[in-house]
Amino acid sequence: NTGGKAPRKHIAHKQAKKSSAAAATGGVKKPHRFRPGTVALREIRRFQKSTELLIRKLPFQRLVREIASEFKNDLRFQSSAVLALQEASEAYLVGLFEDTNLCAIHAKRVTIMP
């Protein structure tokens, strides 16, 4: 014995079981699903690599104008000013979520709560 695993048996039996299951459902293969959390981790890695803005520009611009209109009507903004506000806002939110996540981990939780 070389310590390796023994060859698997009943391969034909497993294949028959698979084909009968497919025949029972009418040959419709159910769509592939990832385990819970796998897609979330993949998205976290993707967004941590990227540097682009995550909030859409026009909705953010409307929000800025709405908030500014409470102080003074008919204010005008340079496009670079709105972009600077968006960069700062997203940086603040990312930092806030990082701190929130650390608090959740400290409390032995995974989910962040409001």
Swiss-Prot record:
Write out the biased-composition intervals (Basic residues): 1-17
Which SUPFAM superfamilies does this UniProt record tie to the protein? Histone-fold (SSF47113)
Q: Give one GO term, molecular function aspect.
A: protein heterodimerization activity
**Top-level taxon of the source organism:** Eukaryota
Q: Where in the cell is it found?
A: Nucleus; Chromosome
The family database entries (Pfam families) matched by this protein are listed as: Histone
Q: What GO cellular-component annotations does this UniProt entry give?
A: nucleosome; nucleus
Query: How does the annotation summarize its subunit structure?
Result: The nucleosome is a histone octamer containing two molecules each of H2A, H2B, H3 and H4 assembled in one H3-H4 heterotetramer and two H2A-H2B heterodimers. The octamer wraps approximately 147 bp of DNA.
General function of this protein:
Core component of nucleosome. Nucleosomes wrap and compact DNA into chromatin, limiting DNA accessibility to the cellular machineries which require DNA as a template. Histones thereby play a central role in transcription regulation, DNA repair, DNA replication and chromosomal stability. DNA accessibility is regulated via a complex set of post-translational modifications of histones, also called histone code, and nucleosome remodeling.
The family classification in the record reads: Belongs to the histone H3 family.
Tell me the protein's name.
Answer: Histone H3-3
Q: Write down the species.
A: Stylonychia lemnae
Q: What is the lineage of its organism?
A: Eukaryota, Sar, Alveolata, Ciliophora, Intramacronucleata
Encoding gene per record: H3-3
